[in-house]
């Protein structure tokens, strides 16, 4: 009699890696009309090596063959590419759904009407404050009004279930109820994500990331009111604050297993928050296409191997938090097999106080001079926008 092999649990299948990513982030351009102080890709200027329209279409063809359901398109500000809408139409016509993140600069009433007529496009508007004072201190003067105008245009056009994407910071964690109300006003869904010390975020992380008390506040809010709030894998490092399973979301680092990132020049990174040579798996143009990189790169094979708990092996919360975020540890100069810098047991804080060597960024696409670290209190004057002309 042939024995039936048990089907691995879903998380076990994820840990071993899938034939195609569940969540593929594609940064179409580094060009951006804003200069957000925490931008994970240090965007601003367009890279002259940026993939052409045809090269992008070739990648979409490959994603269709791999049966990738959808891509998260970002940047930079993806809508400043002159071929952006052409690429969106091409993707949806080839069975690849599109979710794109935007600051709202190009979401006019006409564009909103076009988006409302599509069944395969999702729109995510970035906001980091529930009012202009908080938001514009991080994203630039006028960015709050621009984002709200985009939400109004989408709502008026009948676009259903847009997303409002919020990076939780020390300054906006008290506004979670206000963000939820803003989403309800425009028939949108609230999505909140963790601040990572990546890109320009490395310069401001010490001043912007929530305190330990605010982490508890965030956790309690998510447990009490977060049923309809999207978080992805942002806050699995907080799982140890309560009962197992109390916090919704994926308690797993999916880097190279179920997620990855394609950058504007075709480089493939293990994680959207880890744009650094250490996490570079290959290049679509020079390494035989995306499928070859995803399925055969040495880095991805290593990430799919069973991982040691390292310094967290004796912690009773390890099965819940899995040691936290790889990118957060790497960009704060902490060992990858050690505690998360925001470890709820408090092990991250003393690790951060020790001498550390923070990795230098692999690339910086900022326009002009980098803004310095922000003050602990709100800035009295929003940072000036670096770029008032077309960044393309």
UniProtKB/Swiss-Prot annotation:
**Composition-biased stretches (Basic and acidic residues):** 354-367
**What SMART domains would the database entry show?**
Elp3
Chain residues that bind [4Fe-4S] cluster 2:
253, 260, 271, 325
Provide the Radical SAM core domain boundaries.
Answer: 18-228
E.C. number(s) listed in UniProt: 4.1.99.26, 1.3.98.7
Q: Which SUPFAM superfamilies match?
A: Radical SAM enzymes
Q: Which family does it belong to?
A: Belongs to the radical SAM superfamily. MftC family.
Q: What PANTHER family does its record include? A: PQQA PEPTIDE CYCLASE, RADICAL SAM DOMAIN PROTEIN
Q: Which NCBIfam families match?
A: mycofact_rSAM, rSAM_more_4Fe4S
Quote the protein name from its UniProt record: Mycofactocin maturase MftC
Originating gene: mftC
């Amino acid at each position: 009699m042939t024995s039936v092999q048990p089907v691995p649990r879903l998380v076990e299948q994820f840990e071993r890696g899938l034939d195609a990513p569940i969540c593929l982030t594609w940064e179409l351009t580094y060009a951006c009309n804003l200069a957000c102080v925490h931008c994970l890709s240090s965007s601003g200027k367009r890279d002259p090596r940026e993939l052409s329209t045809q090269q992008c279409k070739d990648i979409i063809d490959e994603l269709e063959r791999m049966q990738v359901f959808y891509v998260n398109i970002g940047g930079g500000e993806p809508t400043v590419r002159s071929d952006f809408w052409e690429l969106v139409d091409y993707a949806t016509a080839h069975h690849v759904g599109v979710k794109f993140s935007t600051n709202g600069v190009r979401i006019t009433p006409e564009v909103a009407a076009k988006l409302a007529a599509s069944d395969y496009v999702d729109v995510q508007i970035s906001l980091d404050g529930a009012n202009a004072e908080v938001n514009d201190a991080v994203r630039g003067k006028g960015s709050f009004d621009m984002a709200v105008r985009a939400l109004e245009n989408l709502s008026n056009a009948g676009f259903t279930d847009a997303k409002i994407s919020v990076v939780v910071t020390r300054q906006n964690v008290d506004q979670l109820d206000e963000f939820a109300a803003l989403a309800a006003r425009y028939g949108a869904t609230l999505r909140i994500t963790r601040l990572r010390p990546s890109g320009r975020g490395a310069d401001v992380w010490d001043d912007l990331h929530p305190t330990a008390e605010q982490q508890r506040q965030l956790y309690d809010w998510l447990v009490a009111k977060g049923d309809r709030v999207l978080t992805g894998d942002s806050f699995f490092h907080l799982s140890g604050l309560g009962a197992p399973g109390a916090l919704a979301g994926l308690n797993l680092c999916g880097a190279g297993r179920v997620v990855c990132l394609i950058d504007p020049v075709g480089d493939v990174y293990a994680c959207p928050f880890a744009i650094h040579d250490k996490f570079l798996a290959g290049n679509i143009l020079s390494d035989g296409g995306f499928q070859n990189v995803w399925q055969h790169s040495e880095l991805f094979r290593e990430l799919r191997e069973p991982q040691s708990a390292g310094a967290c092996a004796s912690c009773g919360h390890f099965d819940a938090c899995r040691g936290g975020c790889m990118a957060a540890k790497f960009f704060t100069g902490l060992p990858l097999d050690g505690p998360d810098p925001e470890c709820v047991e408090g092990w991250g804080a003393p690790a951060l106080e020790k001498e550390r060597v923070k990795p230098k960024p692999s690339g910086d696409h900022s326009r002009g001079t980098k803004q310095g670290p922000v003050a602990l209190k709100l800035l009295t004057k929003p940072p000036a926008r670096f770029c008032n002309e077309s960044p393309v």
